């Protein structure tokens, strides 16, 4: 069996190498990658990947060549189905866990702190993310498989476990059960570690000696694999970091595949790597101008960006408008706000009808809907004063990270908090923290990335030591504004409540730093899979770490929710993020800096960037969230897949190059962006910059387009002001595509 496995992998690898050499440089990379996103037909029980696959992953981490995978036919389907059980009804203390002596009227009390994990049943052949690919999948050429075939299709019939720590627990459970069977100890009273599903009973007296020895040998191999995993775990790292490192390694391979297939694929790969992986870059800081030098002489004694505004003088409880702001279209606005509890609220329409006050209107509506004003004794005039002051500190001239985005994230978080699976799970204070964090999470955003601020030696980067620069600034401004006149909406909270809320808000907003994405995803997936393996299907959420982890991922999902919204909204968000990226690219060009990935308006592929963004970032995140709240997020996943297919269909087809061009493309592959991901935080690779500059200098990309803003003002923004004759001729031979605005990740 071992020889057969090696032969298959060897043949697959050869086929992969031959196909890679034959592909055209400008061929669409994502069509080739589609077979890797396997379709799950059903999910009925938890299942470990075969031991041979797990050993391949382990071997990939080792430098010793003698570590040969040991295949096994050990039956692994011994883990429990996710059962529905009662949630714990005790209260929860943010600092100290459950508290039996808390009054039912205490806003910190939760009616139920347990989250029930539901079994994943059949759902319409949806593709799975790259997280469910085994290491052996990477040896298969994307060109050698049809769209509907997958080597992993048999494996994925059940709920496959992919996080290493959960795999170790499941494997040890297998070892325990087989040990009990081999030693005739099955008659003992069942314990919490006994199998909770229908496992075929094995009796030593009824099986042959050969089968007995085979089962014993394979059980020993499982135990060896567990020991190998645990030996690599360092004491200073958490078990969820095992998953984080694994996911980063898998994403690294995916991006390397993508970068080798086309110039635009290389650009998308570089963007995803630079934005969503926690990597440090050595940069050449340009010499500051005289004006900048004079500006930096001022002491950093105050939080920058805070403006003195007066909204409270004209507000009294008796004259507060119905939705917090004055508007001549109150009835129409009321009609739109009827969808405030639904996914896909038309937030751009809300902005138009409210005089560009969507954040104030939506926050006020949600606070009324959830009765938070009464629960926390918040004066309505104080709430409106704070919200208008906060909204004024979002920059109207920033295309994406503005008050409309903040309102969208607030409303999305509100809907996610209301999902049936999370009913009665979180306390009122936790709900308040999540909504408040969503409202302030991008306040005073300058429209450039953290890396831009670091590269330009900005005052903010100096103040926050290059660590989550913008996220720290958003928090500082959001809390500082509470000190303005009649703005303290938390004035009637107890000291303990206020401290707890502040801690939660800080943890949630810092988690919106996109460079922390893979760590967040790995933590959530490890927690979900571990609970599936070790319990009857209930996440107790009886400690602060678990609860804040769910809230962090919830707001992170809301922040990356644009591709899951109706296509009309998604396209508008795409236009906006690309406009913001291009403005940053223009500033970098003016300064003589290297232009950041996806920020060069002369060389950007909007459609391919969205497909890659969904495949490698959004889909894995929402797939994991949907696992947590199953089946509540299935419609969201369906919309995400539909939107992905739409952008896929709009990718223009490039004509096949001549043989000479093809040969030239092969030679150029050695200059492609190379992803050398170092998993240890202290020694990240920074080789991307040198090789990535090759791509940015080439402005003849045929994927540049005109961005059609579908806002209320319907403006048209030319992305290519000067296009080379070859690119023009190439575009004329293809159908013209209008790329609308939409969602792209927070930078």
From Swiss-Prot:
There is a cross-link at residue 326 (Glycyl lysine isopeptide (Lys-Gly) (interchain with G-Cter in SUMO)). It is found in: Cytoplasm; Membrane; Cytoplasm, Cytoskeleton; Cytoplasm, Cytoskeleton, Microtubule organizing center, Centrosome. 3',5'-cyclic AMP binds at residues 401, 610, 613. Sumoylation of long isoforms by PIAS4 augments their activation by PKA phosphorylation and represses their inhibition by ERK phosphorylation. It catalyses: 3',5'-cyclic AMP + H2O = AMP + H(+). Residues 325-654 form the PDEase domain. Binds 2 divalent metal cations per subunit. Site 1 may preferentially bind zinc ions. Binds 2 divalent metal cations per subunit. Site 2 has a preference for magnesium and/or manganese ions. It comes from the Eukaryota. Zn(2+) 1 binds at residues 405, 441-442, 559. GO terms for molecular function: 3',5'-cyclic-AMP phosphodiesterase activity; 3',5'-cyclic-nucleotide phosphodiesterase activity; ATPase binding; calcium channel regulator activity; metal ion binding; transmembrane transporter binding. Zn(2+) 2 binds at residue 442. Residues 1-28, 282-302, 649-747 are annotated as: Disordered. Inhibited by rolipram. Activated by phosphatidic acid. Residues 701-712 have a biased composition (Polar residues). This is 3',5'-cyclic-AMP phosphodiesterase 4D. The gene is Pde4d.
